[in-house]
Design a protein with these regions (language model features):
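C-terminal accessory/binding modules appended to enzymatic or scaffolding proteins
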Residues: 385-432
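Short proline/glycine-enriched turn/loop segments at secondary-structure junctions
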Residues: 291, 403, 447-450
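Intrinsically disordered, Ser/Thr/Pro/Gly-rich linkers and terminal tails that flank
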Residues: 272-279, 346-366, 385-388, 423-428, ...
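Serine-dependent protease modules
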Residues: 34-346, 352-357, 363-385, 390-395, ...
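Conserved residues at beta->alpha junctions
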Residues: 251, 417, 437
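N-terminal secretory signal peptides that target proteins for export/translocation
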Residues: 1-12
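Bacterial N-terminal signal peptides
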Residues: 17-32
Length: 474
């Protein structure tokens, strides 16, 4: 019995030793494989240790240019010395600079309108330092975009293709390319901070892409580029208390840029499409009443008689939540999404009516009414002599940032001739409401009133949103 127990203990020790040997062998076999998967390795090239935008910059930067302008300013009036010695008033040249983007291979360049506004001559310098004189095809103050053309003598230029900003998301990497402070072409990087900023107060189609890429004076008109080398937008403005970049820049989206460029190339006039409605943003209380879990959309407050919205069946009280699948949150966003369509195209509006979702197709079209060709020069001997006037209409309102629902409520002062009596009393933008107690809804009505043989004129006008009344004796 004792011998048997001794043999059993001996066998157990042998089995344990054998098991331990097998386990160690397996461990040694596995360890090299595990080590090979986790061992650190010296990078074989700089591409493996650096994140670089260099290939993207090489692709995109040749399509970004410097824009220089000159304006001849003549001294107004004469000094005493000039009068005594017969010296003519002196003139001087004002220079300004900005950036631009080549969007057409044969010399079509887009920039900001405020870069070229009022200038007499334009000069474009390419990234390879070639210089060209440029001509202005279109300058649109309300979109703050302008289109220049240079003569390349048939030589194609590098072009930035337009991005579809419907695919742009907050957090996307972008590059800002331009000529800040005139130091030369400069590239900064950042991300998309917001995609639909409407409270910027720069133009009437406020719908901006916000970025934290450094943008400074001189960057205006330059490119905001995505990682595919596409033009996301034209850098336009910054928010700053010091004049320098604080990481809040704004770019006009590529859809609006393309619309203005196409208009410039195809005729030189940017026609603003119109829906024929007015609305207000939705508050939290209105959203709750509509059965929404968050404020979204524009509540229709007015529908222009006979306009596109009325013909399509929209009514006051309808809640427009989206255009072509893109959500809207205020009237500016609504106007922008309509304006990026060509006149005559259909826009699909998603609406809520009585708590029920519907879709309505609206044909966007130019607003009706008088154009620049309908401006009338008043030449009688009255206080209005020298004033150029035109009847209020939706088209005039859209072109001048007025309320398009003011039809038939006055005569718009388009301009005033220098050296005439009207220049003493009227300014461009005034709205003539009544003369000598008679309302003036049409130019013919105003002309009829002005035929009266009188020297006293009781006038009521609207100026900058305020009613001004007064009596003028001639």
């Amino acid at each position: 019995m004792t011998h048997l127990m001794t043999m059993t203990r001996h066998a157990s020790k042998l089995l344990a030793a054998a098991f331990l040997a097998v386990l160690m062998a397996l461990t040694m076999a596995i360890m090299p494989v595990f080590a090979q998967g986790t061992a650190e390795r010296v990078p074989a090239s700089t591409a493996e240790i650096s994140l670089t935008f260099a290939p993207l910059v090489r692709q995109a930067s040749p399509a970004v240019v410097n824009v220089y302008t000159e304006k001849n300013v003549t001294q107004r009036g004469m000094t005493l010395e000039q009068m005594m010695f017969g010296v003519a008033p002196q003139s001087r040249v004002q220079n300004s600079l900005g950036s631009g983007v080549i969007v057409g291979a044969y010399g079509i360049i887009v920039t900001n309108n405020h870069v070229i506004q009022g200038a007499d001559t334009f000069r474009v310098v390419l990234s390879d330092r070639r210089e060209y004189a440029a001509e202005l095809l279109l300058g649109d103050e309300r979109t703050d975009l302008a289109v220049l053309r240079i003569n390349t003598e048939g030589l194609p230029l590098p072009v930035l293709p337009y991005a579809d900003t419907r695919d742009t998301q907050v957090g996307d990497l972008v590059l800002a390319i331009g000529n800040p402070f005139g130091v030369g072409q400069t590239v900064t990087n950042g991300i998309i901070s917001a995609t639909a900023r409407t409270d910027v107060g720069i133009n009437d189609y406020s719908f901006f892409i916000q970025t934290d890429a450094a943008v400074n004076p001189g960057n205006s008109g330059g490119a905001l580029v995505n990682t595919r080398g596409e033009l996301v937008g034209v850098n336009t403005a910054i928010f700053s208390r010091t004049g320098g970049s604080v990481g809040i820049g704004f770019a006009i989206p590529s859809e609006m840029v393309k619309r203005v460029v196409d208009a410039a190339v195809n005729g030189g006039t940017f026609v603003r499409p119109w829906l024929g409605l007015a609305g207000q943003s939705v508050s939290f209380d209105i959203a709750k009443a509509q059965g929404l879990d968050r404020p979204i959309g524009v509540m229709v407050t007015e529908v222009y008689p006979g306009g596109p919205a009325e013909r399509a069946g929209l009514r006051r009280g309808d809640l427009v939540t989206a255009i072509d699948g893109r959500e809207v949150f205020d009237e500016k966003g609504l106007k922008f999404l309509a304006a990026i369509r060509n006149p005559g195209e259909q826009a699909r509006l998603s609406i809520l009516r009585g708590g029920k979702a519907q879709a309505i197709n609206v044909r966007v079209e130019p607003p009706p009414g008088a154009t620049e060709a309908d401006v009338v020069l008043l030449t009688n001997g009255s206080v209005f002599n020298g004033a150029r006037v035109i009847e209020l209409s939706p088209r005039l309102a859209e072109e001048n940032g007025l309320d398009p629902f003011t039809r038939g409520s006055g005569i718009y002062v388009h301009s005033v001739t220098r050296g005439t009596i009207s220049r003493n009393y009227f300014r461009p933008g005034d709205i003539i409401r009544s003369v000598n107690g008679k309302q003036t809804k049409t130019v013919k009505e105003l002309q009829a009133v002005l035929k009266a043989n009188t020297r006293d004129w009781d006038i009521e006008i609207e100026r900058n949103g305020r009613i001004v009344r007064g009596t003028v004796r001639t």
